Amino acid sequence: MRARRLTAAASVAALAVLSLGACGRSAPDVAAYVGDTTYSVDRVDAIHDEAQATYAESVKAAAAQQGASPSPEQLKLNVDRQDILNLLVGIDLGKRIAEDKKVPVQDQLSAEQIGKELGVPNTEYAKLAAEWYDLYLGLQAGLPPAELTDDSRGDLYAALVKADVAPAGWSVDEQRQQFAGAAFTRQVSAVSVALQDEVEKLDVTVNPRFPALEIPALLQTQSGLRQFDLPYVDGNGQVTDVSTPEPLPTEPTEPAAS
């Protein structure tokens, strides 16, 4: 994925979501519909533009201290509007899941920490990113792990390759072998399953200008935390086939491996 999102405590009100009346679900100024709530394109643009402007100023200030002039490419924040929508919708759905499944969510990443790390201090993007990752880490730890199919394992592998977390070229058998002992694969798949369930329940619809809805996921590696995006809704508002949840036991059984 790209260097981006993280940070902790924006309320639903701070998301500036709009109440949806009895209208259709294809307005061009709406980025996404989540149940009876809409997220406007203007809102997505405003969050992105604030983060971009703040990042450019941070880069200029750092370069000035060294007597340098940054290039236009260096001034560009590696976060796009798709990333913003992923956060807005992910937080909405994640809160519903945590409440419904009684999953505890703790403050683990602060807006201040993320804002400083990414060069976007005091921005709504930093707040949203931290809030999402607190939710993500809570859901990943608190939901029952899910089993992967070859197709869903391939989707996860493709996301890791795209983020330069895994090398390209693994065969299906190699993917099975490499992921066999990796607990995170079943954990992130559990988050995907829960999000897919909410998408279907709430009739989530995405504006065609956004290619997908993705999970901004974290992975602990030997070189530190890495980030990657795992799609769970395609650009037509359809749930993707990412994983299959394990059935919940009706009688006490041995706990599932995590």
PLM features per residue range, with description:
Residues L18-A22:
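C-terminal motif of bacterial Sec signal peptides marking the signal peptidase cleavage site
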Residues Q106-D107, A146-D150:
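Solvent-exposed, non-transmembrane alpha-helical starts
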Residues L148-S258:
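A C-terminal, polar beta->alpha supersecondary segment
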Residues D45-D80, T123-E147, G154-S189:
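Well-structured core secondary-structure elements of compact alpha/beta domains
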